[in-house]
Amino acid sequence: RDRLRSRGLGDVYKRQVLCCWAAWSKWASTTRIGLVNFQNYQTASLVKSNEDNFIEYEEIPLDRLDRLGRYDLVLGFGMGLKITEEQRAQILAAADEGTPIYIYAATNPENDICSLDSLTKAGISAYIGNGNKRNYRNMARYVRQHIDAKRLFVTPAEEAVESASDVLYHLDEDLSFKTVADYEKYLREQGIYREKAPKIAIVGGLNDPFSGNRANIDSLIVSLQNAGMNVYPVSSYRQRLAFLREIGPDAVIHFAHGRMVMGQADAAVEWLKERNIPIFSPLSMLETQEEWESDPMGMFGGFMSQSIVVPELDGAIYPYVLNDQELDEEGIYLFKAIPERLKNFTRIIGNFISLKRKPNAEKKVAIYYFKGAGQSSLTAQGLETVPSLYNLLKRLKAEGYTVKNLPATEKEFEKLLMTQGAVLSTYAEGAFDDFLKNGRPALVGKSEYESWVQDALPEELYADVVQLYGEAPGRYMSTVREGEPCLAVARIDLGNVVLLPQPMAAVGDDAFAIVHGAKTAPPHPYIGAYLWAQYGFGADAMIHFGTHGSLEFTPRKQVALCRYDWPDRLVGTLPHFYYYTIGNVGESMMAKRRSYATTISYLTPPFTESKTRGQYKELMNKIEAYYKTDEARQPEASIAVKKIAVKMGLHRDLRLDSLLTQPYTAEEIARIENFAEEIANEKMTGQLYTTGVPYSPEKIRSSVMAMSADPIAYSVAALDRQRGKVTDSQLKSQAFFTQHYLEPAKQLVRQVLGGQKADDALVCRVAGITPEKLAEAHTILTPPRRGMMMGRATTPTEYTADQKREAQAIAEVERTVTNIQNYKRALEELSLIHISEPTRPEPIS
């Protein structure tokens, strides 16, 4: 009986415990919010904003979507959400089983999943859409109060407030300023504002300055202020350009994720160009410093596109890693400025501004050029290098730069380059002795060089150099002065301008491989040449003259460089300018991204036609006669063609027989005709471009013709083919294409150059379309805007492949026709910019 009574009491106790547990779970237990596909910095803002002990956030990996039922709300971030059909089914199943789920900001309609009622969805959207610390905190409380429906330990949620936008801000995250005047008044009241100090505007950023996760922003503001600058952080999308105009900054720092001013991109670029305001685009990495430094790529994919590639359209420079994400004591990833890189980036900004403000006579410039070993001349793609460099030096002197001892003639200057600016091979011992005697190199003692190395290079990086080449200064380009080993740095001293031949980036015989990416650390002379410019000469700016050298191809990362990447270390904090051909976009991107270069374009050699049509006139006449001849007499006409083709040697180029008794077939005649037309229409470059020597009007016209005629001809042909007006076999005939498309295109270019208005009416006439068709092409090729209304994505119109191809051909006709005069003006301006005498009082830098 006692056992039964005891068992009964136990059952009662268990029921009481279960009832208490049920009551606790229903009314008081911790509210769990699961996060799907949120970036670390977004998660950090949500977690750090939460002040309630009975609310927790947890990240849910995509491979654990089977656990969604454990959460009181599953909140997903739809942008960039890539899930399989199976994973999507798991989310839908959890929603069907009663789990509150909301995928916010879904860009894929299939991921637009929400099991909340419309009012609750609107409430969550209002909180997260106006993301700031206060709204995030109240969103968590709203979830506990209204979605999880808890009764105990509940702090009532306040209404969502509109996040501060189109404002300036400072270190106090509770303050914002609607006008520049109000902001400057605040700075003066705080004793921070400096009269006549440089103004630095900060725009963009992955992390919102009002979200709580902003230590990196605060660090940058403080660092720039401590360097004597007035800092203007702007939080705005719609009024960004208006704020910049009101501020009038000396420089803009854009934490980029796309264009700097959406909707006004071109207007912003023009405004900045007019005022010579540089845009810096430092990078924020979504990983820890250790992870980033060990990654050989640095950055890739869509994140690289938005952070590096697209900002280049605005003219952004210095894709310099400034921030990373680090774990705090709670295991939350927070954005942090990397101390060493923040210090260097602040110096970079200061050095650029100093370069703008310092008198030309005081500026010190180190100019690197490229030449082979020994008596090889200077080289640069498409450039007459020696006369161009000589013209630049004369221009610098005319602009007030301190250029001393410049030879009176170009010939004497070239001789100076060969004696004092030589590049010596590792085997040229006799030549090196002569160079020491007559070349006047800068001698850098071992102790001084190693002190520079200690300041500029990490120990691990320099250890690779010592392992490969031995202790400094090594055996190459080294000597002894007063008992101390020294590096001999080749340089030509012209006062405040110094010329340096770029040394070999590695030791070996394969010059091409050395220039285009030696896989090893550079030798001491290479390092010494760059460190001497910074520490020995004290340069204010570095210029690489001509396309191209080896700096941007030294190891390691492709982009988003770190302290273990050679270009990052050798450029240091110097403003770097690269005089680069306009015709090599691919490798110029390497220069911009891997050596932080601001590229200054020079023209390609002017284009002309080969002018060989006259040589083929007799042949083309015989071919035309062949086509007009009746079938019975065609063998005779074919042999007439063959005699001329063999006489001109065309049979060898086309690998045809030379037996003059055997006629060519119709197919072989067509091959000869196409080959002759191709040669006759071939574009070729004339003499190399010389800086300071403008194109002649005729060369400008021939270059515009070469740039314009082909795109128009091929685009119109593509439209005609799509409409069934021509066949593929007709378009394969070079003679047919020339007669029906290329020659009319050339005539059109001549007419526009002669003054015909290049407007929509002309575009429609050339393309054979109506104005409505032109407007439709614009619509098809315009990327769909991601219209967000309470997190819902709009569905873009779908177009067929034929519609897209037609639109692209129409757009190419429009682009080319409307730019014919622009090409002409650009060539005129570019060829005049670098004339040897100044045309305007402003310094060219």
Region locations from a protein language model:
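Ligand/cofactor-recognition surfaces for anionic moieties
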Residues: D11-L832, S836, R840, S845
